[in-house]
A protein has these predicted regions:
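Acidic/histidine-rich, metal-coordinating catalytic segments
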Residues: 97-111, 137
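C-terminal domain-tail junction helix/linker
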Residues: 32, 167-234
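Mobile genetic element proteins and their domesticated derivatives, centered on retroelements
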Residues: 20-22, 61, 67, 86, ...
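Extended, low-complexity cationic-aromatic segments
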Residues: 1-87, 199
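Short, basic/hydrophobic alpha-helical segments
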Residues: 80-101
């Protein structure tokens, strides 16, 4: 958690831009009956029945210091889709940057190995060398600013029945252009100091130097004089002696 929060405190640097990346799955749904038109005092009304048209995946890369975001809609979510997104990030969005810092969640497709699954080894290494990946902790995806932008995208644009992936692409592109023109960003205020106070329960409790548990560990450590080989010899001899005693008793 503190690793991600530290990234957010870094100053703007054109050679080391900072972005957040997230994705969501959008279910495609079409109408089975035409909606009833608007009437005075009544909104447009939709039938409760609908038809499933599959799903698509929506990637969003957000640069909070620039007030820019880029939406990519794909037919599915695979290693290759994420790999192409990362190549586009370093070659198209920030071609002159030395390294791009990316905050993202620990989804199974968000790994460097995805680049090697998609490109030749030399190309995969070239892309990976230009990326600095910082993963949010488990159950900590709220630390990703891109998740906030995805909520805005869904609430303003995609939270309705859409049955065609081409419509999703067109609507997302229009939303992206409008938000980028306004240079909308996220006013992030949660810091490491806040985390250590408000999320204190998540931190391990440090033991005092002379606490009973610390003293017990020291005593147990002091008793470990012999080497591991000597200890194994003792255990082996003990087993043999115990076996001989059992034979005598029989």
């Amino acid at each position: 958690m503190e690793d991600v929060l530290e990234v957010y405190t870094r100053p703007e640097d054109p050679q080391h831009p900072r972005v957040c990346m997230d994705e969501l799955s959008k279910q495609l749904v079409s109408e089975t009956r035409a909606p009833l038109p608007l009437r005075p005092g009544q909104p447009r009304r939709y039938d409760y029945e609908y038809r499933r048209e599959g799903v698509c995946n929506v990637f969003l890369v957000f640069a909070p210091l620039l007030g820019q975001r880029w939406v990519t809609v794909t037919a599915q979510r695979t290693y290759q889709d994420w790999a192409y997104l990362m190549r586009d990030l370093v070659d198209v969005r920030f071609p002159g940057a030395e390294r791009v810092t990316v905050v993202l969640d620990n989804l199974n497709t968000h790994v460097g190995g995805a680049l090697y699954e998609t490109f030749e080894p030399a190309e995969a290494k070239r892309i990976l060398d230009k990326l600095e990946l910082h993963y949010t902790p488990k159950h900590g995806s709220w630390l990703n600013m891109a998740e906030i932008e995805l909520r805005v995208l869904n609430g303003q644009c995609l939270d309705r029945r859409i049955g065609d992936v081409r419509v999703v692409k067109r609507e997302s592109a229009a939303w992206e252009a409008e938000r980028n023109a306004a240079e909308a960003t996220v006013d992030w205020r949660f810091t490491t100091a806040d985390a250590r106070i408000k999320l204190k329960r998540l931190y391990p409790v440090a033991q005092p130097e002379n606490s009973p548990s610390t003293v017990r560990v020291k005593r147990n450590t002091a008793k470990l004089g012999p080497t591991e080989a000597a200890l194994r010899t003792r255990r082996r001899a003990h087993k043999q002696t115990r076996g001989q005693h059992e034979l005598c008793h029989r």
